Amino acid sequence: MSLTRVSVTAVRNLHPVTLSPSPRINILYGDNGSGKTSVLEAIHLLGLARSFRSARLQPVIQYEEAACTVFGQVMLANGIASNLGISRERQGEFTIRIDGQNARSAAQLAETLPLQLINPDSFRLLEGAPKIRRQFLDWGVFHVEPRFLPVWQRLQKALRQRNSWLRHGKLDPASQAAWDRELSLASDEIDAYRRSYIQALKPVFEETLAELVSLDDLTLSYYRGWDKDRDLLEVLASSLLRDQQMGHTQAGPQRADLRIRLAGHNAAEILSRGQQKLVVCALRIAQGHLINRAKRGQCVYLVDDLPSELDEQHRMALCRLLEDLGCQVFITCVDPQLLKDGWRTDTPVSMFHVEHGKVSQTTTIGSEA
C-alpha cells in the first residue's frame, strides 16, 4: 500500500500543500528548520492521530489556527483506494474519517496506514524504558495477528480493575478472583502472540542486520513479565501483599521486555551511535518484511535525516534495504546528493524541496516497478 495523495493544512510552519508522492522513494530536502520533518509529522498524524515530536497538541497546530487537518488517499494492497482524514483541534478534540465515515478509534487509521518511523529519537528503542520496546513489539503483533487487539483490550480492562482494587480495596474476594483469572487468561494469550512474533522476527532481523553491520554477538531475547516456570495466577497470589503496598500489579505482560544485548551486555551501553541507528533500522525493516509475509499490506516508512550518524557505505546499504522492501518511503535530508546514488535506475524516486514551509516537487526519476 502507498499514499497517492497527501494534503496538509495548518501543521506547524507548513504552507497548505497537496503532494502526489512516488509509490516508492520520496526525498524531502532543504535547510534545517525549513519544514521537512513537519511533512513527516503530518503523515504520522494521518496514520496514528498523534505527533512523534510533541506529546502536546498545541505546538503542532499553526499559530492562530483553531485546528490542523491532514487528508490522504491510500492505495490498498487489493488495489482499492481508501480516503483518510484527520482534524485535530487545540482543545484536544479530533475527528477521524475513513472513506466518508467517522472512525471509532485511531486503531482503524493504524490498520489502514501502517507507519514505521526512524528518527533521532529511535535510539530510545535501545536506550529507553521497557515500555518503548513493548510498544515496538505490540505494534508488530497488531499488524500480523488480527486476534491480538481484542485480547490486548481485555488485558487492559482486567489490569485496570485489579489495580483499582489494589489501591481502594472495594472488590469482594469472589470478584477479585474472577478478575485475576481474566488477567491470567488474557496474559497467557498475549504472551503466546508475542512469543510467536519474536520467533518470526529474530531470523529476519539477523539477516537484515548482517546486510548493514557485522555484530555477530548481538542477540534478541524476550522476557514475558513474570517467571517463565510459574503460572501467573500463582505469581499474583504470592505477590498480593506487595502489590497492595505498591498500588499496582507487579507481574504480567505489562512488565515484558525485548532485551537487546551484545556479548551479554546491554547493547546501548556498548554500540556507537551509528551502530545503534543501524540496529534500530534493522529491527524496523524486519517488521516491514513480516507484514509483507502476512499479506496484510505494506508499511510506509518515515525516515528523518537518514544520512546522520552514517558514512557513505552504510547510507547506501540502508537505502538498498529500504528499496528492497518494495514499499513507500519518505526520507528527509539537508543535502540530496548524499542519497542520489542509493537507488536503482528503475525505482521511481520523487524529490521535494522544502523552504520556509513551502514544499515543491523538483524531480521525478525512474519508473514504476
Curated annotation (Swiss-Prot):
Top-level taxonomic group: Bacteria
- tRNA-binding as a keyword of this entry, yes or no, is no
Q: Does the keyword Cytoplasm apply?
A: yes
| Record key words, sorted | ATP-binding, Cytoplasm, DNA damage, DNA repair, DNA replication, DNA-binding, Nucleotide-binding, SOS response
One GO term under biological process is:
DNA replication
Location in or out of the cell: Cytoplasm
**Residues involved in ATP binding:** 30-37
Major subcellular site:
cytoplasm
GO terms of molecular function? ATP binding; single-stranded DNA binding
* SUPFAM superfamilies from the UniProt entry: P-loop containing nucleoside triphosphate hydrolases
One Pfam family of this protein, by short name? SMC_N
Any single GO CC term annotated in Swiss-Prot or TrEMBL for this entry: cytoplasm
| InterPro entries, alphabetized | DNA-binding_RecF, DNA-binding_RecF_CS, P-loop_NTPase, RecF/RecN/SMC_N, RecF_2
Per the similarity annotation, which family is this?
Belongs to the RecF family.
What does the function comment of this entry state?
The RecF protein is involved in DNA metabolism; it is required for DNA replication and normal SOS inducibility. RecF binds preferentially to single-stranded, linear DNA. It also seems to bind ATP.
Quote the PANTHER family the UniProt record gives.
DNA REPLICATION AND REPAIR PROTEIN RECF
NCBIfam families in UniProt: recf (TIGR00611)
Spell out the protein name for this chain: DNA replication and repair protein RecF
- Organism source for this protein? Pseudomonas aeruginosa (strain ATCC 15692 / DSM 22644 / CIP 104116 / JCM 14847 / LMG 12228 / 1C / PRS 101 / PAO1)
Task: Give the encoding gene's name.
Answer: recF
